[in-house]
Regions:
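Structural recognition of the conserved hydrophobic beta-strand(s) that form the central parallel beta-sheet
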Residues: 133-134, 158-160, 172-177
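Conserved catalytic/switch belt of AAA+ P-loop NTPases
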Residues: 123, 144-166
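Conserved alpha-helical scaffold flanking the Walker A/P-loop in AAA+ ATPase domains
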Residues: 28, 89-132
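Phosphate-binding P-loop
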Residues: 19-21, 28-34, 125-127
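Conserved Walker B
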Residues: 134-140
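Walker A/P-loop
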Residues: 38-70, 81-82
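Dynamic helix-loop-helix/coil hinge segments at AAA+ ATPase domain boundaries and subdomain interfaces
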Residues: 2-23
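Conserved small/polar residues in nucleotide/adenosyl-binding loops
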Residues: 180-182
Length: 182
């Protein structure tokens, strides 16, 4: 992590991102307090780039959730790999499989789960918690914003077939908003 506000400026500068002292202060405090970093501004001012630079400096994985109108929880958290599940069903049928309970348990396991950005950000990583960039939040609708608030308040999501998945270490969250969409 960063040791001071000057350290934020210096290390980000080494990665090609020059930031003001005010922005460096906000970044430093956000990390020290373990709170999300909320950045708003016009398109092209570097809101997304700071997340990339921070990931490079901190050696963390960057996970980006690009927001758009109509984005829903299933697109942001997870979905099931239906084609692979269908192949497994057909294979079990062809092999004369009769244990439907075992097949159902297998079909709704990690093997067939496609992790989307929010779920991916809650997975353990050897380099520490990832940086979760929620980009252009202003493009989403209120129901998704409410869902996101709930998911990020406890850093956990519930998948009905698997149960609740909680981040062992909360991700570093950066939210961006473009003034042009307000």
């Amino acid at each position: 992590m960063f040791t001071s506000i000057d350290d934020v400026q210096n290390k980000l500068s080494e990665k090609g991102y020059v930031c003001s002292r005010a922005l460096a202060t906000v970044v430093f405090l956000s990390l020290k307090l373990g709170r999300p970093l909320f950045l708003e501004g016009e398109a092209g001012v570097g809101k997304t780039e700071i997340a990339k630079a921070m990931a490079a400096v901190l050696g963390r994985k960057l996970i980006r959730l690009q927001c758009y109108e109509g984005l829903d929880a299933s697109s942001a958290v997870y979905e099931w790999n239906f084609p692979a599940q269908m192949v497994a069903i057909r294979t079990a049928e062809a092999a004369g499989g009769s244990n439907k309970d075992a097949l159902q348990t297998e079909l709704f396991s990690d093997q067939y789960l496609i992790k989307r950005p929010l779920l991916e950000a809650m997975q353990p990583d050897e380099n520490g918690a990832p940086i979760l960039l929620i980009d252009e939040l202003d493009r989403t609708d209120e129901p998704f914003e409410a869902f996101l608030l709930e998911a990020l308040s406890d850093f956990q999501v519930t998948i009905p077939e698997l149960g609740t998945i909680k981040a062992p270490e909360p991700p570093i969250v950066i939210l961006t908003l473009s003034l042009i969409h307000i």
